[in-house]
Swiss-Prot record:
<keyword id="KW-0678">Repressor</keyword>
<keyword id="KW-0749">Sporulation</keyword>
<dbReference type="InterPro" id="IPR036390">
    <property type="entry name" value="WH_DNA-bd_sf"/>
</dbReference>
<dbReference type="InterPro" id="IPR023187">
    <property type="entry name" value="Tscrpt_reg_MarR-type_CS"/>
</dbReference>
<dbReference type="Pfam" id="PF01047">
    <property type="entry name" value="MarR"/>
</dbReference>
<dbReference type="GO" id="GO:0045892">
    <property type="term" value="P:negative regulation of DNA-templated transcription"/>
</dbReference>
<dbReference type="GO" id="GO:0003700">
    <property type="term" value="F:DNA-binding transcription factor activity"/>
</dbReference>
<feature type="domain" description="HTH marR-type">
    <location>
        <begin position="12"/>
        <end position="156"/>
    </location>
</feature>
<keyword id="KW-0804">Transcription</keyword>
<dbReference type="GO" id="GO:0030435">
    <property type="term" value="P:sporulation resulting in formation of a cellular spore"/>
</dbReference>
<dbReference type="GO" id="GO:0003677">
    <property type="term" value="F:DNA binding"/>
</dbReference>
<dbReference type="InterPro" id="IPR039422">
    <property type="entry name" value="MarR/SlyA-like"/>
</dbReference>
<dbReference type="InterPro" id="IPR036388">
    <property type="entry name" value="WH-like_DNA-bd_sf"/>
</dbReference>
<comment type="function">
    <text>Negative regulator of protease production and sporulation.</text>
</comment>
<dbReference type="GO" id="GO:0006950">
    <property type="term" value="P:response to stress"/>
</dbReference>
<feature type="DNA-binding region" description="H-T-H motif">
    <location>
        <begin position="62"/>
        <end position="85"/>
    </location>
</feature>
<dbReference type="InterPro" id="IPR000835">
    <property type="entry name" value="HTH_MarR-typ"/>
</dbReference>
């Protein structure tokens, strides 16, 4: 006897279509806003994302960048190479891992990344603006627990761990000062 599926084909296609359509709509807005944000720094989204990941991982392998940046390994490598040519990243091998290629931010790369964060303006981000009515109504931004669960099942717990680590580092490693996000230096961290 055939085992019945718990979910119908119709439910599956409706869910998948809703998710695809809403994700595409949100991504279109995020992509436009992200490109506008980083354009003055002569960066594209992949390059900025690589700087972001490398900053939060304090150096990263090309494989990690591909995994956490949700991009093909060749994309991660090629855009990292462009960043290296601009003096923003360096390539190296680790003593404990000669197989993988690692990238680290140069001081210039770190400074540029931090400049991009200082230049962020919430009023220019449509998705953020779209969430404000929810915050006004409920006193907090939407939670992402269901979405995180889906992503965890698709990409695995390592992806979510890195995501949460980056958020914690952003929360703990930056302060708002004069309407801008600034990195907390090691002296400030020890007194906070």
């Amino acid at each position: 006897m055939e085992q019945q599926t718990a979910y119908s084909l119709k439910q599956s296609i409706i869910f998948s279509h809703k998710f695809a359509q809403l994700s595409k709509a949100l991504w279109k807005s995020v992509e436009k806003d992200w490109q506008t944000w980083i354009k003055p720094f002569n960066l594209n989204i992949n390059e900025h994302h690589i700087l972001w990941i490398t900053y939060h991982l304090d150096g990263a392998s090309i494989s990690d960048i591909a995994k956490f940046g949700v991009m093909h390994v060749s994309t991660a490598f090629n855009f990292s190479k462009k960043l290296e040519e601009r003096g923003l990243l360096t390539f190296s091998k680790r003593e404990h891992d000669k197989r993988n290629t690692y990238v680290d931010l140069t001081e210039q790369g770190r400074e540029l990344f931090l400049e991009t964060l200082e230049a962020y303006k919430p009023s220019t981000y449509s998705v953020y603006g779209g969430a404000l009515p929810i915050k006004d109504l409920y006193g907090k931004f939407p939670e992402f627990s269901e979405l995180l669960s889906i992503v965890r099942h698709v990409y695995g717990p390592d992806f979510i761990d890195m995501f949460e680590t980056a958020l914690t580092r952003l929360e703990d490693g930056f302060i708002e000062e004069d309407g801008k996000l600034k990195a907390v230096d090691s002296e400030t961290k020890s007194t906070v």
